[in-house]
Regions:
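N-proximal low-complexity "stem/linker" segments adjacent to membrane-targeting elements
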Residues: 2-33
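Acidic helix N-cap motif at the loop->helix transition within catalytic regions
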Residues: 25-29, 52-61
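Short, acidic, metal-binding catalytic loop of nucleotide-sugar glycosyltransferases
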Residues: 32-41
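Short beta-strand/loop segment that forms part of the nucleotide-sugar
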Residues: 41-50, 72-73, 102
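A conserved acidic beta->alpha catalytic loop
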Residues: 47-56, 106
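Conserved donor nucleotide-binding strand/loop of the catalytic core
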Residues: 55-94
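Short beta-strand-to-loop acidic/aromatic patch adjacent to the donor-nucleotide binding site
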Residues: 96-107
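Conserved donor-nucleotide/metal-binding helix-loop-beta segment in metal-dependent transferases, i.e.
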Residues: 111-119
Length: 119
């Protein structure tokens, strides 16, 4: 079961999907790093019921980035691959033209997002 907290209202044709499980140490920094890029991205966090409070941090940030930051909370630890699939389905249903996957631990550099978008 998933919960949608906000609808896609701000204009952006590019979505960054960030799957999470116990990423409270990284999630705020990665979200802020994506939002500091010159290109206007939306972010979808797909959280697998993190017991460390990752989703609580994201929900607080949603008030700072309304209609740009979204969260889908899944009830169990379903894995990275299914989190990305969930995110892609969410993005396609909302007609995003560009969908970028990014891990919360900075193994993908947020600065590279604009290069992918300009490809």
């Amino acid at each position: 079961m998933c919960f949608l907290l906000h609808e896609n209202l701000f204009m952006s044709d590019a979505l960054v999907i960030i799957p999470t499980y116990n990423e409270k140490e990284n999630i705020e920094a990665i979200i802020r790093a994506v939002f500091t890029q010159k290109k206007s991205f939306h972010i979808l966090v797909v959280d697998d019921n993190s017991p460390d409070g990752t989703s609580v941090i994201v929900e607080k940030l949603i008030s700072e980035f309304p209609n740009q930051l979204f969260i889908e909370k899944r009830l169990g630890k379903n894995g990275l691959g299914t989190a990305y699939i969930h995110g892609f389905k969410w993005a396609l249903a909302r007609k995003y033209e560009y969908i970028i996957e990014m891990d919360a631990d900075f193994s993908h550099n947020p600065k590279d997002s604009k290069n992918i978008y300009n490809f």
